[in-house]
UniProtKB/Swiss-Prot annotation:
GO biological process, alphabetically ordered: ribosome biogenesis
Domain spans labelled EngA-type G: 4-167, 175-351
Protein name listed in UniProt: GTPase Der
SUPFAM superfamilies attached to this UniProt entry: P-loop containing nucleoside triphosphate hydrolases
CDD domains attached to this UniProt entry: EngA1, EngA2
Family: Belongs to the TRAFAC class TrmE-Era-EngA-EngB-Septin-like GTPase superfamily. EngA (Der) GTPase family.
Name of the encoding gene: der
The keyword GTP-binding belongs to this UniProt entry's keyword annotation: yes
Keywords: GTP-binding, Nucleotide-binding, Repeat, Ribosome biogenesis
Binding site for GTP 1: 10-17, 57-61, 119-122
Repeat is among the record's keywords: yes
Domain KH-like: 352-436
Organism this protein belongs to: Streptococcus thermophilus (strain ATCC BAA-491 / LMD-9)
Length: 436
């Protein structure tokens, strides 16, 4: 399902990020005890009154060294391009500024719903001053104190009221995948090679992909696929795609819509922090993942080259131990024929269900190999486990005390489940729950 998008805009220091974190709530602070897994704070998903939406903090995309007005223009451009609803944040302490009026004039022309959030209204006496913001011509101002959580419910009500009423329902039989990675890793050339047609215009200059469309195709066995392009959704007019953070945001949106993600690495440049960041987001989102090393034809090789590359990838992406690695060349089409079959296989892993009886046999065998740990004389007791969902496969393990389930033992159980059932290319989630 494609979620509607809400963008937060406003000049610096009005509290955009604080409001973003307040709306996102606990969803923003996802932490896993594995190095390299981080969720970027410029993009997340949120929910209010049973309506889900994607949330963008455009201020997090800015180049802080850019001129003040250029930053604001940049934000407004992103909002106009990406958002279904725009939240315009101003400061109740400072009143209406020239910069606020400048942004308002831009937003007024978008013909998109704009919610005016007057932030930093931290006490009732300040409410009398918010009426000055009617001069911006954007409708009723909403008094907010994002630090204290006051008024955010009213803003959320307004967001939900203005979200598109029809949400695209996607065919569950179609496998959706995206190619993500830094500019100039060869995503466009890979797309062209996979499709066998020049559907996306590619250039050797980084950041020159302009098209923004999903591409549907069918393999020889009748399996339907949708390839999601990371060049931006509903793109119109100029898009600020020269910043790495904007590229990160677009990749995150593509990941959210995908079942399987192809993490593309440029063999000529190796692994960068950007790659780890995006891969971490895909891992946390529970997506199937394939690590694709492109431009393999440009690398000088000996008998140890592949093994050395694989070892380095496993070391740098320790949290992706389940993800297969494939070395390809879009230019020579080396191993590209393997990709559709790998995507299909990993999609099947994402949707695999294990019966409780078979699962519990594996859990009991695991306990026999490695008995449950103790803490202060009390031993963890596992009663049974059951699979509760797919995409990604998620299992609940019922225990006597959740606190006794140490991270290392949970990882051991995960490894035993993987050995028994495979689950190639997909994260699996294990949740300890106290039996009532």
């Amino acid at each position: 399902m494609t979620l509607p998008t809400v963008a937060i805009v406003g000049r610096p220091n009005v509290g955009k990020s604080t409001l973003f974190n307040r709306i996102a709530g606990e969803r923003i602070s996802i932490v896993e005890d594995v190095e390299g897994v981080t969720r970027d704070r410029i993009y997340t998903s949120a929910e209010w009154l049973n309506r889900q939406f994607s949330l963008i903090d455009t201020g997090g995309i800015d180049d802080v060294d850019a001129p003040f007005m250029e930053q604001i223009k940049h934000q407004a451009g992103i909002a106009m391009t990406e958002a279904d609803v725009i939240v315009f944040v101003v400061s109740g302490k400072e009143g209406v500024t020239d910069a606020d009026e400048y942004v308002a004039r831009i937003l007024y022309k978008t013909n998109k719903p704009v919610i005016l959030a007057v932030n930093k209204v931290d006490n009732p006496e300040m409410r009398a001053d918010i009426y000055d913001f009617y001069s911006l011509g954007l409708g009723d101002p909403y008094p907010v104190s994002s630090v204290h959580g006051i008024g955010t419910g009213d803003v959320l009500d307004a967001i939900v009221e203005n979200l598109p009423t029809e949400v695209e329902e996607e065919n569950p039989d179609i496998i959706r995948f995206s190619l993500i990675g830094r500019p100039n890793v060869g995503k466009s050339s890979l797309i062209n090679a996979i499709l066998g047609e020049d559907r996306v215009i590619a250039s050797p200059i980084a950041g020159t992909t302009r098209d923004a469309i999903d591409t549907n195709f069918v393999d020889s066995e009748g399996q339907e696929y949708t390839m999601i392009d990371t060049a931006g959704m509903r793109k119109s007019g100029k898009v600020y795609e020269n910043t790495e953070k904007y590229s990160v945001m677009r990749s995150m949106r593509a990941i959210d819509r995908s079942d399987v993600v192809l993490m593309v690495i440029n063999a000529e440049e190796g692994i960068r922090e950007y790659d780890k960041r995006i891969a971490g987001f895909a891992h946390e989102a529970g997506k199937g993942i394939i690590i694709v090393v492109n431009k393999w034809d440009t690398i000088k090789k000996d008998n140890h080259t592949v093994a050395n590359w694989e070892a380095d990838i496993r070391d740098q992406f320790q949290f992706l131990s389940y993800a297969p690695i494939v070395f390809v060349s879009a230019k020579t089409k080396q191993r590209l024929n393997k990709l559709p079959e790998m995507i299909k296989r990993i999609s099947e892993s994402q949707n695999r269900r294990i019966s409780s009886a078979v699962l519990n046999d594996v859990i009991m065998d695991a306990i026999a190999i490695n008995p449950t740990p103790t803490d202060k004389g009390k031993r963890l007791k596992i009663f049974y486990g059951t699979q509760v969902s797919v995409k990604p496969p998620t299992f609940v393990i019922f225990v006597n005390e959740e606190e006794l389930m140490h991270f290392s033992y949970m990882r051991f159980l995960e490894n035993q489940i993987r050995q028994a059932f495979g689950f190639e290319g997909t994260p699996i989630h294990l949740i300890a729950r106290k039996r009532k």
